[in-house]
Design a protein with these regions (language model features):
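Sec-dependent N-terminal signal peptides
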Residues: 1-14
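Cleaved targeting-peptide boundary
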Residues: 11-36, 235
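Structural detector for internal amphipathic alpha-helices that build alpha-solenoid repeat scaffolds
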Residues: 29-41, 62-76, 85-88, 94-108, ...
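Amphipathic alpha-helical scaffolding segments comprising HEAT/armadillo-like alpha-solenoid repeats
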Residues: 40-54, 76-89, 97, 108-122, ...
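Charged, low-complexity interaction regions
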Residues: 56-61
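Short, structured interface segments that constitute the first stable element of a domain
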Residues: 154-159, 165-169
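Terminal, low-structured helical/coil segments at or just beyond the last alpha-helical repeat
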Residues: 225-251
Length: 251
């Protein structure tokens, strides 16, 4: 009954793709930011002092954005702390996201360490758009496989529409870095999501399946691309992909 109701709702609003129907065109990919030139410590300290003084007054969003841009015109470890502060606390998601981008262009090891910490920040967790930028920043600057346990749970924790960008950022990271630990996540999200047993009392409600279906529709082609990056193969179903992976396990 649950499957029937969900199918009816989805069919009426936005029919699932059939057979060989063309995929929904992907959204334009934002251009990667250019690396920043190094700033000497004296100039960096002066920039941070100016930023901190300006932060004490009441400012518009445009003024706050300008301050962030002026702070991080270059790269220096001194910029990491104030950028983290903006990423967590600014009133504007636009300003917070820009701070994360600029943070990702700061020197290692300070910047990658700060980005990893932001993954666990409650303030960032409450803003999926900012969290998506954090994942993209990690992919850009210093991702290593030890970070995967912090990133993986973010994908399926919620399939609400506002988290689609985060899920796409995770898939982009997997594709870019060929993260083989993500194989199970990809298999779990390759097929059209429907309940395995609609009569199971522990089965999530219809609203869950509806949200998950629309999320899946948005990024399903990216799941296929991530699997291709890992295997060099194209798969139509999770069973097909699993059979190949089981047969070709990494040594």
């Amino acid at each position: 009954m649950l499957t029937l109701l969900f199918t009816i709702v989805v069919t009426l609003q936005d029919p699932p793709p059939q057979g060989g129907a063309p995929a929904t065109p992907a959204a334009p990919v934002a251009a990667e930011p250019m690396p920043l030139a190094a700033v000497d410590d004296k100039a960096a300290k002066a920039a941070v002092d100016t930023f901190n003084k300006a932060a004490k007054g009441k400012r518009s969003m445009n003024e706050r954005m300008k301050a962030v841009e002026e702070l991080a015109q270059g790269a220096n470890k001194a910029f990491v702390k104030p950028l983290v502060g903006v990423a967590e606390n600014d009133e504007s998601l636009v300003v917070r996201k820009r701070a994360v981008v600029l943070l990702s262009l700061q020197p290692a090891p300070e910047a990658p360490r700060a980005l990893r910490a932001l993954l666990k920040s409650k303030k960032v967790e409450a803003a999926p758009a900012v969290l998506a930028e954090v994942v993209s920043g990690i992919a850009r600057s210093g991702y290593d496989t030890t970070m995967w346990p912090d990133i993986e749970p973010l994908f399926a924790s919620d399939y609400a529409a506002e988290r689609v960008g985060l899920q796409e950022a995770i898939l982009a990271l997997v594709t870019k870095h060929k993260e083989h630990k993500a194989a199970k996540l990809l298999l779990d999200n390759l097929d059209e999501p429907i309940p395995a047993d609609e009569h199971d009392p522990s089965n999530p409600p219809a609203e869950y399946w509806k949200a998950r279906w629309y999320a899946w529709k948005a990024w399903r082609e990216k799941v296929k691309e991530a699997l291709f990056a890992l295997t060099g193969q194209r798969f139509s179903t999770a069973a097909e992909a699993k059979a190949w992976l089981d047969k070709n396990k990494r040594k």
